[in-house]
Amino acid sequence: MAIRQLPEMLINQIAAGEVVERPASVVKELVENALDAGATRVDIELEEGGVRLIRIRDNGGGIAPDELPLAVSRHATSKIASLDDLETVATLGFRGEALPSIASVSRFTLTSRRHDAEHGSALEIDGGRLGEVVPRAHAPGTTVEVRELFFNVPARRKFLRAERTELGHIEEWLRSLALARPDVELRVSHNGKPSRRYKPGDLYSDARLGETLGEDFARQALRVDHSGAGLRLHGWVAQPHYSRASTDQQYLYVNGRSVRDRSVAHAVKMAYGDVLFHGRQPAYVLFLELDPARVDVNVHPAKHEVRFREARLIHDFVYRTLQDALAHTRAGATPNSIGSDGAGYTGATAGEMGNIASGGPANHGNAPGRSGSAYSYANWTPSQTPLGLRVDEARAAYSALYAPPPRNAPQSTGMPSMAGTGLPATSEDSGVPPLGYAIAQLHGIYILAENAEGLIVVDMHAAHERIVYERLKNAHDSIGLHAQPLLVPMTLAVGEREADTAEREADTLATLGFEITRAGPQSLHVRSIPALLANAEPEALLRDVLGDLREHGQSCRIASARDELLSTMACHGAVRANRRLTVPEMNALLRDMEATERSGQCNHGRPTWARFTLSDIDRWFLRGR
């Protein structure tokens, strides 16, 4: 078959296949153009989910009459002029493909007026056929009207979903935009009826956050704002008990652009680590700011993805920032105590605990089977399988934590004391500690405590398990990770890419306890392994580490395996169900919870405590009605 030059209309329709997937894609491209033009108000009118009509009206800078035909020409743009501009682009659009692509598959009208012009001008395009520029009355700004999307491409139109589905995609993208640009007023109408209005406000406005993601997220979100190495990460991360079954509340913006990035998503998941219940997803709204020259935005047709020039640095920065924010959450903090450093934790309410429980079974440390409650224990089996790990080195740290007290010391349960923590033992307002004072033990499982707000219920095994676990981790962090030399080096057959990674990352592997040299194109000599994990299938572990280093630039496999061992030890060392505690022992546990990082969840991600305010209890008994 002979090679031929494709006609311009067909070229535009091919480009439309990449840029215009559905009505939401059209709305995205047109609204981004409005924002790049400096608009502070954008009106979006839709009919039949955007298939019949999409009309975008803005108050931006407008387009001159003689530039209207150029605006709908391929690769015509006002945003870049050279390769240097492309490498440092800061606008949302830059390719000049959107308008001609949309115009080629719809009945398209572009009307615009510059602020210094006496009247506006309009240009109509019908399925790619260009009309004449004509004068038209119009307010300063631009209106783009897209009718009968895909009317001339029946195969594409056939794949569009139901009206409600297409409208849902548009609304989801507008939520994402509303979070990124709270300074812009957005008005949306569908089939002639107003459906949504986002009022302009401050970036950190609780009102904008609440109306986009819901009041629950706004109440449970931790503010994050950290800068370093020419990077800034700010926004909100939901507390661990506010988790989701899906990734529907994960928003990442790079220099104001909504994107998806596997490396950043991996860093976030790592940061949540052992505070997120199995199978649940974190919720967050994060803004990453950096020099535009350090990120390539020209890697995806719809600009949904970016490529970082220093991916490892970005991954580490995001991970450490969020890990620090989540580490400072402690049991007993009220919503008012949550600051920009992430310190503070509001605890799970009864409804939230039930929501977490619906994602999987819960472990209450030998608790008897129950039915008819939010949790079901009868058929529960531990989610952590026994590990073939060497525990001798961990025993020393474990024993040190639980050494018998001196003869003249008061008796305790072996729970670490709060002495020397430097943390306030009481709340500033009432003089009562955040978790209050113990008043009773329920069925040998729960501690009931009274604080200034009402009733606190604590799962004593889960809470003590977290306390022991954090103490064990801190003890091992102070010791460091030791390498165990092998009497006979182990030869490991790997792929060439894995061997290249091992050679390139030799220093990183050494910090993890592996001493590795290259034996051949597809083989490695392993001369030492992490001592604590000597019996944990080092070959499989090393392969996983190499895979992580190749894909993400770093690996948490060693730390995860170590933490899994310490978590198992903490679970076995924690106070068990049906253990009767005295009131002083229960109070000691409450004080330790207030002083321990991540004490809002046990090692498996379950909540350790819940709060029932006095007003909640009054409502149960219809008091005040």
From Swiss-Prot:
A Gene Ontology BP annotation from the UniProt entry: mismatch repair
Keyword annotations from UniProtKB, A to Z: DNA damage, DNA repair
Pfam families for the chain: DNA_mis_repair, HATPase_c_3, MutL_C
Cellular component per GO, a single term: mismatch repair complex
Sequence segments annotated as region (Disordered): 404-427
Cystine crosslinks: none
SMART domains: DNA_mis_repair, MutL_C
Coiled-coil blocks: none
GO molecular function, one term: ATP binding
Function summary: This protein is involved in the repair of mismatches in DNA. It is required for dam-dependent methyl-directed DNA mismatch repair. May act as a 'molecular matchmaker', a protein that promotes the formation of a stable complex between two or more DNA-binding proteins in an ATP-dependent manner without itself being part of a final effector complex.
Similarity comment: family membership: Belongs to the DNA mismatch repair MutL/HexB family.
Name this polypeptide is given: DNA mismatch repair protein MutL
Organism per entry: Xanthomonas oryzae pv. oryzae (strain KACC10331 / KXO85)
Encoding gene, per UniProt annotation: mutL
